Amino acid sequence: MEDLMTGTYNTEELRRDNGGFMVPDFSIEVEGKQIRRSSKSGTLFIDSVCLKLSADAAGSLTFDVLNAYDQEARKFTDQVKETLKPGNMVTAKFGYAGNLIKLFCGYIHSVNYEYNETPTIAVTAVDMVRLMQDNEEDGRIYTGKSYTEVFQAVMKRYSSICPSKDIKTDSPAAAGEPLQIAQKGSDYTFVKDTLCRLECRDFFVLAGKAYFIDAARKKKSVVSLEWGRDILSFSCERNYVYEKLRVQMVDENRKTKSLEKEITFEGKHQKRVIPSPGIKNVTIDSEGDAERAALQMKKAVDEEKQKEVRCSGVCIGIPQIVPGRNLTVRKLDSWIDGTYEILSVEHRIDENGYTTQFELGG
């Protein structure tokens, strides 16, 4: 199977390989034990499941377990309580009969026992990002030849849930004299707001793998969707944007100086409210490294572009649609049709079938 970050598909192939999208299916394993989707007398089963993925938040998996209550003994069985306890490892695959793709690996964060007409256990699992958000190593000092090396040092604390073989990094933007850096805030804040900025990286966790990859990489479109065929609903919000990005650089002497290049952003299909753009100052910390400064500036530009357009939609269930990729939409309107970055995704399978909800930017 192709990596979720690199595979490209077309809907005709997906429709053919997944039996016309007719039989949605999923698999959930807790500590290696599978919980079935369909009911059999006396066995646990799940009738619906929802997976939320984001490039900027922890992934979460929610599902309700039925057939877990012993009516005669008036209790949830001990075996069930042992299986569905906080801290147990969970993996989830989504797709169609005979063709499932792993999208989530994490641990049970909360278990809610609901006593009603049909006693139910509601389970919420989260991925490694939640652990990183809750762990504050404020003031810890790291040394390394690159910020990628520092990132790998941070990730060693999570080797039990994400071993080194599941950490995907691009080559450092620059490597030279050993550097030293102090952590501020949680592990997640340190990686996301400091290391990603300094090394021009994107960081996210997907299907149990941690990605620390080039933010300026060319993001291929995972698939092209057509309204009326693949897209069930879609909305697009265009915002007023007219600003000049003025970039400042912190050099090796910790002094701030302005770069000569200024970039003006102006949204399409809009009228200027005032004749000149607003000014936004962005400071990049490249320690005098011109290559790193250029990469950080490109990342800042890409982030500003996200402000102009925000879209959301729902399509037939396609597990290959994940954050960190691009998505192409067609046959909506000539000024909307195009390729956008996937910001967040929700995969849901219930009595109504399998749908994928997405948020796009760019």
Annotate each PLM feature:
Residues 1-128:
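Assembly/oligomerization scaffold segments
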Residues 1-15, 212, 221-235, 264:
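Compositionally biased, intrinsically disordered low-complexity segments enriched in polar/Pro/Gly
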Residues 48, 102-107, 122, 139, ...:
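Well-ordered beta-strand positions in beta-sheet-rich domains
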Residues 51, 55-82, 232-362:
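An acidic/polar, Gly/Ser/Thr-rich interaction patch typically located in mid-to-C-terminal regions
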Residues 92, 212-213, 249:
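Short hydrophobic/aromatic-rich beta-strand segments that constitute the beta-sheet cores
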Residues 105, 148-152, 188-192, 246, ...:
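Extracytoplasmic/secreted envelope proteins and their assembly/folding machinery
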Residues 106-114, 216-218, 340-352:
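Short, compositionally biased
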Residues 117-230, 236:
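Charged- and aromatic-enriched interaction segments used to assemble
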